[in-house]
Amino acid sequence: MATSSSSSSSLLLPNINFNSRQSPTITRSVSIAGIFLPRNRLSYNHNLRIRTRLIRASKDDNVAVEDRDNAVKINGDYNGSARLNGNGSARKSVNGDFNGSARLNGNGSLVKYVNGSVTVETEEVTKKRKEEVRKKRVEDIGQEDAWFKNNTQQKQVEVSVTPGGRWNRFKTYSTIQRTLEIWGFVVQFIFRTWLSNKKFSYKGGMTEEKKVLRRKVLAKWLKENILRLGPTFIKIGQQFSTRVDILPQEYVDQLSELQDQVPPFPSATALSIVEEELGGSVEDIFDRFDYEPIAAASLGQVHRARLKGQEVVLKVQRPGLKDLFDIDLKNLRVIAEYLQKVDPKSDGAKRDWVAIYDECASVLYQEIDYTKEAANSELFANNFKDLEYVKVPSIYWEYTTPQVLTMEYVPGIKINKIQALDQLGVDRKRLGRYAVESYLEQILSHGFFHADPHPGNIAVDDVNGGRLIFYDFGMMGSISPNIREGLLEAFYGVYEKDPDKVLQAMVQMGVLVPTGDLTAVRRTALFFLNSFEERLAAQRKEKEEIAAAEELGFKKPLSKEEKQEKKKQRLAAIGEDLLAIAADQPFRFPATFTFVVRAFSVLDGIGKGLDPRFDITEIAKPYALELLRFREAGVEVVVKDLRKRWDRQSQAFYNLFRQADRVEKLAVVIERLEQGDLKLRVRALESERAFQRVAAVQKTVGSAVAAGSLVNLATILYLNSIKTPATIAYTVCAFFSLQVLIGIIKVKKFDQREKLITGTA
């Protein structure tokens, strides 16, 4: 009678070793989930070892079962057959040195047998294999992203200078040399830009085609020198790569190549950094480590590896970045302080360049600490854990340090690769909507958003019909509660057409500085609020007319003259108020807003690339309606409104008892006016503009007279062989000549602004 013993555990990948007198040792792999039932058919002796944790093992009288260290060893005599039964159905014969057959029943499916090796997949293994196949497909479609690999079918960025240049070896030269290198680049760029706008620099006359060609050449030169200067300037170039409102399209096209097409640094250096940071050799830590990087960015590069059976990627930081940032940011602060003095622009916005610099410097220093990036990644993933269309790679904290970041390998296709997305079979229109919705969630709901959303940091795979994959969380933005509340209040003010509420919200956010007289600002806000709905209706009507015209086979867009006329009409209505705003400069531009505006400008460009009819306002409309419903139904909002109303009523009740005093004060003011003791100051904007222009002209004329006198004096001295004083006189003459040139430009700007304000431009 047979006796049996059993034990429960989970069955992993066992190895079966057959040793017999008739054949050498052969290793066969079996993956099952079930019951092992050996039968004793004596033919020759062999040993059977299953390296696994057994679910249940049964034995006959003549078979010994030993369970030790997750291994089951069965010794006995077999007549060429064994039977493995489980919770499924799979049967296959085994051909090999072991003469017999095996029946394998598992809760999966039998895949194959080769020379006595049988593989049975469980549901978990099958799911894992399918996921690997899916990832491999995404890799094959998006393989062009590894632009720096030697592939003749891919278009690579042409960089004539040595990528990495001296900044990769900056410890070998001094801070002074680096500073001279930076300012040499700045001076060259200013001179080249100035020269490209001068007629005498064009052979055969200046034409628009020649100017475009010159801008393309200069833009390529700018990109190559930014690459040569290194990570700090690459980051700045990335910031401007989407600002089509500042730079011509030729510059934007070249700077966009800085977004993720940055040359990698030597892999040997990356390998040494990984081993130093993780405290061991890559052979001991990883099952596999790919020597060649799969991507490179301004601050580091990415290598694939296999860790404990899982595919991972390692983000390795470029060496010596902090010392390089210390040098570069000192020079950039000088530039920011200069811009703080020469700005504001004529739009009335006085940008706080020093604050923007401080914010950027803080972000750069945070980006070179990968532990902070890992924390940002986990916070971001937690915010979107309930959304199926957003994926964030998981972090392996045990293998993450300030210079090495280890995370889950999640392949994807860049969101601006239209042909690859079509080949993947995802809905591009839906992807554009998802991108905007995800950012609205980040800003309005969480107040924590990805501040660098260029196409290199947003990818797509085919999960759930198209899923957004976010990478690189080193550059994140946070919106404080008062700014978020101010944004909502401004939105409600626009909806209710209440200029006072809009201005109050702008003051709360720090965008508007309350000056002594906000009358011009209020009138301008009221004008835009009143015309907002009319302009939206006109735009909708214009779109309908254009669509109808296209259906009939012709299109009649507005001519350039008609657009200019509409612009003149708008300026004529509020021109004086805009000029007063420009003079008072009540607006400020918080540093956080630069990242928000940049993010939505990037998303708008991405969306229009995915869908020609992309309209960001249509996507944001449901969120606006939801905010309005919350405004109407939210308990907290109702309580807040009641509190505000109570404060206003309390103030009104208090003022009721002060009316007599105010009437008395008004009578005193009128009496002083009648007696001539009170001066009334009236602001005449036309006179102010005229005086400013006259002052500029007078200064220019004075500089011209001084330059003329000095050039005569220097010439006389030189002719009389008095060379040293002549040289000094020529130098001072050059200074006054430069002042004359600046004065002429300033007078021209005054004239242009006058024409723009009066609508005669």
UniProtKB/Swiss-Prot annotation:
Provide the Protein kinase domain boundaries. Answer: 288-648
Q: Where in the cell is it found?
A: Plastid, Chloroplast envelope; Plastid, Chloroplast membrane
Transit peptide extent on chain: 1-57
- A single GO CC term, please? plastid
Q: What is its EC number?
A: 2.7.11.1
- Record field: transmembrane: 725-745
Recount the UniProt induction comment for this entry.
By cadmium ions Cd(2+). Progressively repressed in senescent leaves. Levels follow a circadian rhythm, with lower levels during the night. Down-regulated in response to iron deprivation.
Residues bound to ATP: I294, A295, A296, A297, S298, L299, G300, Q301, V302, K315
Q: Mind listing the GO biological process terms from this record?
A: cellular response to oxidative stress; circadian rhythm; leaf senescence; membrane lipid biosynthetic process; regulation of response to reactive oxygen species; response to cadmium ion; response to high light intensity; response to hydrogen peroxide
Deleted gene: phenotype: Increased sensitivity toward oxidative stress (e.g. hydrogen peroxide H(2)O(2)), high light and cadmium ions Cd(2+). Higher superoxide dismutase activities in chloroplast and disturbed expression of genes involved in the antioxidant pathway. Pale green plants. The pale green double mutant atsia1 atosa1 accumulates ferritin and superoxides, exhibits an increased nonphotochemical quenching (NPQ), and have a reduced tolerance to reactive oxygen species (ROS).
Active-site residues? Answer: D452
Entry's Gene Ontology molecular function annotations: ATP binding; protein serine kinase activity; protein serine/threonine kinase activity
Give the membrane topology: Single-pass membrane protein
Q: Which reaction does it catalyse?
A: L-seryl-[protein] + ATP = O-phospho-L-seryl-[protein] + ADP + H(+); L-threonyl-[protein] + ATP = O-phospho-L-threonyl-[protein] + ADP + H(+)
Pfam families cross-referenced by the UniProt entry: ABC1
Q: What class does this enzyme belong to in the EC scheme?
A: transferase
Q: In which tissues is it expressed?
A: Mostly expressed in leaves and flowers, and, to a lower extent, in stems, siliques and roots.
What the entry lists under InterPro entries is as follows: ABC1_dom, Kinase-like_dom_sf, UbiB_kinase
Its keywords, alphabetically, are:
ATP-binding, Cadmium resistance, Chloroplast, Kinase, Lipid metabolism, Membrane, Nucleotide-binding, Plastid, Stress response, Transferase, Transit peptide, Transmembrane, Transmembrane helix
- Its biological function? Involved in resistance to oxidative stress (e.g. hydrogen peroxide H(2)O(2)), high light and heavy metals (e.g. cadmium ions Cd(2+)). Influences responses to reactive oxygen species (ROS) production. Together with SIA1, regulates iron distribution within the chloroplast and mediates the oxidative stress response. Together with ABC1K7, influences chloroplast lipid synthesis/accumulation and modulates chloroplast membrane composition in response to stress.
What the record says about family reads: Belongs to the protein kinase superfamily. ADCK protein kinase family.
What is this protein called in UniProt?
A: Protein ACTIVITY OF BC1 COMPLEX KINASE 8, chloroplastic
Q: Which organism is it from?
A: Arabidopsis thaliana
**Phylogenetic classification of the source organism:** Eukaryota, Viridiplantae, Streptophyta, Embryophyta, Tracheophyta
Identify the coding gene. ABC1K8
